[in-house]
Every structure is written in structure tokens, then in C-alpha cells.
UniProtKB/Swiss-Prot annotation:
<feature type="binding site">
    <location>
        <position position="85"/>
    </location>
    <ligand>
        <name>S-adenosyl-L-methionine</name>
    </ligand>
</feature>
<feature type="binding site">
    <location>
        <position position="155"/>
    </location>
    <ligand>
        <name>S-adenosyl-L-methionine</name>
    </ligand>
</feature>
<keyword id="KW-0489">Methyltransferase</keyword>
<keyword id="KW-0949">S-adenosyl-L-methionine</keyword>
<comment type="similarity">
    <text>Belongs to the methyltransferase superfamily. RNA methyltransferase RsmG family.</text>
</comment>
<feature type="binding site">
    <location>
        <begin position="108"/>
        <end position="110"/>
    </location>
    <ligand>
        <name>S-adenosyl-L-methionine</name>
    </ligand>
</feature>
<dbReference type="InterPro" id="IPR029063">
    <property type="entry name" value="SAM-dependent_MTases_sf"/>
</dbReference>
<dbReference type="InterPro" id="IPR003682">
    <property type="entry name" value="rRNA_ssu_MeTfrase_G"/>
</dbReference>
<keyword id="KW-0963">Cytoplasm</keyword>
<protein>
    <recommendedName>
        <fullName>Ribosomal RNA small subunit methyltransferase G</fullName>
        <ecNumber>2.1.1.-</ecNumber>
    </recommendedName>
</protein>
<feature type="binding site">
    <location>
        <begin position="136"/>
        <end position="137"/>
    </location>
    <ligand>
        <name>S-adenosyl-L-methionine</name>
    </ligand>
</feature>
<keyword id="KW-0698">rRNA processing</keyword>
<feature type="binding site">
    <location>
        <position position="90"/>
    </location>
    <ligand>
        <name>S-adenosyl-L-methionine</name>
    </ligand>
</feature>
<comment type="function">
    <text>Specifically methylates the N7 position of a guanine in 16S rRNA.</text>
</comment>
<dbReference type="GO" id="GO:0070043">
    <property type="term" value="F:rRNA (guanine-N7-)-methyltransferase activity"/>
</dbReference>
<dbReference type="Pfam" id="PF02527">
    <property type="entry name" value="GidB"/>
</dbReference>
<dbReference type="GO" id="GO:0005829">
    <property type="term" value="C:cytosol"/>
</dbReference>
Length: 245
């Protein structure tokens, strides 16, 4: 018996003012099954129970692109989106499922993970998504990626300042970086404001909320690109995390 994901139509509506179509829900289910299968070889995620997967992977991914509970309008119009350090494909694959007019580039430095995501994209027939084996510090200096994206997504594993350095160089003027975080402090606000300013960005919103099933604390930071990023950013691989701005 296959584990079925919950539909949660009411929660989607209440928290994002949106709910998935039948075909999007079917793709969510297919994604879940593929991740469970891939997990046997690759250790992609510890989150495998249906409700937990729905909340911590699907809902969490999409809540980030819905600041103050409204989906970013450019996603429906045809944005160019990049997901940095996508891992098992979050948040980028769920975003690709719901934003069929947008193009999503999924970046990770681990080739095995990207090979697995290629399988997912093929199985789900997600023609609006593509993958790239690289690091943010490298592509941020490449003309085909620098200042080419409308939206940059990153699930923060450390402090926010390196995330600002990974994302802002990739954005066009007016573009939006979304940094997904758990807890957040006022001290971090000061440091990320300083980093963003040096990188041509400004902190537009710090959205704090709780997840709908387990009431876990979440924060999403939204940085707007308001000026060109100086040419020396991003710095070399490893430097942003070792020596944050």
C-alpha cells in the first residue's frame, strides 16, 4: 500500500490563499514516492512520514514563495528562478510544480543528488526545470548566471549573511532573494542588513510564522536587489561562510 499524502486543501487556502489542482496534487504524490524510493540509496531526507513530508517539504517550500500569505506574483507570470543548494529538490521542485510558467534552475554541488533530481524532473515531466552541478560562489561570477534571475531561493544551513552573498549577485535589479530559516534573532537582522547593503540589496521583509501541523517556528527573509552587486562578490568558494561580510 502506497503512503498517501494528505490533501490539506483548507490549510493551503488559509495559509497561502491558494490550493493545488488535481494534477499538481498528483505530482506532489509522485514526488513523495520518488523521494521515498531514492532515499534507500541516497539518504536524501529523514522526513518520510506523509503528514511530516507534506508540512516540512511541500508546505514549507511553498510558504517561502508566499510572503505574507500571497504567492509571489512573478511566479505565475514567468519568472526565472534559481534554487541554491537544492539537496533533494526543496524548495525548487515544489515551486516548479506550481509555477509552470516560470523556469527553475536547481543547483547543488553534489552530483549524485543532481542525477537523482534529473530522474524526478523526467518522471514528473517538469519541462520548466533544469539542473546544474556547481556552487553559488562559482556561478555568481559567470556571465550566463550573474544578474540573470528574478527570484533566488536558499534554505539556510548557517547564518544569513553568506546566503545573501550566494543569492544577490545572481539577481537582476528588482529581483528577490528568499532565505528560508528556522529561528531568528535581532542581532542577525543587523548583520544581514549590513551584508545586503554591501551586495546591492535591502531587507524588504522578515516574515515569521509557524507551520500548520506542528507549530514549528519559521522565518523567511526577503531581500530585494536595488543596485548592482560589486564585482568582487561573491568571493571564492568557502569564503562567504568562513568569513561572513
Amino acid at each position: 500500500m502506497t503512503n498517501l499524502l494528505p490533501e490539506m486543501a483548507e490549510i493551503w487556502q488559509q495559509t497561502l490563499n491558494w490550493q493545488p489542482t488535481d494534477s499538481q496534487q498528483a505530482r506532489f504524490q509522485q514526488l513523495y514516492e520518488l523521494i521515498l524510493e531514492g532515499n534507500r540509496q541516497l539518504n536524501l531526507t529523514r522526513i518520510t512520514e506523509p503528514q511530516e513530508f507534506w508540512e516540512k517539504h511541500l508546505w514549507d517550500s511553498l510558504r517561502g514563495v508566499a510572503p505574507q500569505q500571497q504567492l509571489i506574483s512573478s511566479l505565475q507570470l514567468g519568472a526565472s528562478v534559481i534554487d541554491i543548494g537544492t539537496g533533494a529538490g526543496f524548495p525548487g521542485v515544489p515551486v516548479a510544480i506550481i509555477a509552470s510558467n516560470s523556469t527553475i534552475t536547481l543547483v547543488d554541488s553534489t552530483r549524485k543528488k543532481i542525477t537523482f533530481i534529473d530522474t524526478i524532473l523526467s518522471e514528473l515531466a517538469l519541462t520548466n526545470a533544469k539542473t546544474l552541478v556547481s556552487r553559488a560562489e562559482e556561478i555568481g561570477q559567470q556571465p550566463q548566471h550573474r544578474e540573470q534571475y528574478d527570484v533566488a531561493l536558499i534554505r539556510a544551513v548557517g547564518t544569513a549573511s553568506p546566503c545573501a552573498e550566494y543569492t544577490l549577485p545572481l539577481l537582476k535589479l528588482g529581483g528577490l532573494a528568499v532565505i528560508y530559516r528556522g529561528t531568528w534573532t535581532e542581532e542577525e537582522t543587523t548583520s544581514v542588513e549590513n551584508a545586503a547593503q554591501q551586495l546591492g540589496g535591502t531587507v524588504e521583509l522578515i516574515d515569521n510564522f509557524t507551520t500548520p501541523l506542528t507549530n514549528s517556528v519559521r522565518h523567511c527573509l526577503y531581500l530585494r536587489k536595488v543596485a548592482k552587486t560589486p564585482a568582487n562578490f561573491p568571493r571564492a568558494v568557502g569564503v562567504p561562510s568562513q568569513k561572513p561580510i
